[in-house]
Amino acid sequence: MTSFLRSDRSRPVAIWLFIVAAMVFAMVVVGGATRLTDSGLSITEWQPIMGALPPMSEQAWRESFELYKQIPQFQLVNPDMTLEGYKEIFWWEWAHRLLGRTVGAVYAIPLIVFLIRRDIPRRLIWRCAAMLGLGGLQGLVGWWMVSSGLSERVSVAPERLMTHLGLALALFVLLIWTALDAWNGSPRVEERSPWRGWALAFLGAVFFQSLLGALVAGNDAGFVYNDWPLMNGRFFPGDYGGAGLWGTLAHSQAAVQFNHRIFAYALLLAAVVLVVLARRDRLLVGQGKSLATAVAAVVFLQAALGVWTLMAAVPISLGVLHQAGAAVLLAVATAFAWRVRRP
């Protein structure tokens, strides 16, 4: 078991970072619900300060609805939507943005206090500052994503959705890793673990699979090919190709779903190899073995949930649960990679 230097740790800082990570997890879940209910384009303006308040009068609601009526999603998809129907989708997007503002405040204000009190271990200060910058960037990316669906499209661009989710998950991983560092302090032992590279590679693979899932979501590809293990009776879909390489990889429903399936099978195989090798390795003890088992278990549960979600044609509840499962898998894979980075 690795021992740590107590002088280089801060439990209050760690607890704060874990809380922010939990809030980012909630953001990912609410974001999934916002997407699945087609609510993401209901607020057509970006007002970081004034936008924190919802419409406060019937006149304000009508004005907001009129703005929504000007975009293609209303004109081509929801021309019969009433004001009451608009309110339903508005609240999802508003809640998602409000939660984002709250996460920013819960991160920035304690950060300033901890810096003044010099409670943050010196080696983590720049990382904490970088995460503040990433949080601000995420807000800009969110609007960049929404803006792609306000003029020519009836939904946001899949690659922008992938960027938005990917940045959220990257911040989630970094928060967990930094919280673990703050909780435990610097390790006394600096020997390089043979598991470090493999664990980081697996974490990267899980992250990449999450990005592929975002492309599936952005293209509504979960609503086609709802059989398994084949795709409309074939292993390789006949309409895999799109308009060029990028059109295939980012915009073909058949391609993005096939890629997500194939990489899921690869992750399943990698998880089996991971847990078998971890169980046989005498140098990996205690938490390392337990976390390896947990990683494999969550991979299998997430894969089963993905198949269920697909075959059920993506009901909102299962779609949100599958997105939450991706974040849980990332969290467990992060904990495993962090724990085995040294003996």
Curated annotation (Swiss-Prot):
Membrane topology: Multi-pass membrane protein
Binding site for heme: 260, 322
Pathway assigned in UniProt: Porphyrin-containing compound metabolism; heme A biosynthesis; heme A from heme O: step 1/1
Substrates-to-products reaction catalysed: Fe(II)-heme o + 2 A + H2O = Fe(II)-heme a + 2 AH2
This protein's UniProt keywords: Cell membrane, Heme biosynthesis, Iron, Membrane, Metal-binding, Oxidoreductase, Transmembrane, Transmembrane helix
Major localisation: membrane
Origin superkingdom: Bacteria
GO terms, molecular function: metal ion binding; oxidoreductase activity, acting on NAD(P)H, heme protein as acceptor
EC number: 1.17.99.9
Compartment(s): Cell membrane
Quaternary structure annotation from Swiss-Prot or TrEMBL: Interacts with CtaB.
Family note: Belongs to the COX15/CtaA family. Type 2 subfamily.
Role according to the record: Catalyzes the conversion of heme O to heme A by two successive hydroxylations of the methyl group at C8. The first hydroxylation forms heme I, the second hydroxylation results in an unstable dihydroxymethyl group, which spontaneously dehydrates, resulting in the formyl group of heme A.
Protein name listed in UniProt: Heme A synthase
Organism: Caulobacter vibrioides (strain NA1000 / CB15N) (Caulobacter crescentus)
Species lineage: Bacteria, Pseudomonadati, Pseudomonadota, Alphaproteobacteria, Caulobacterales
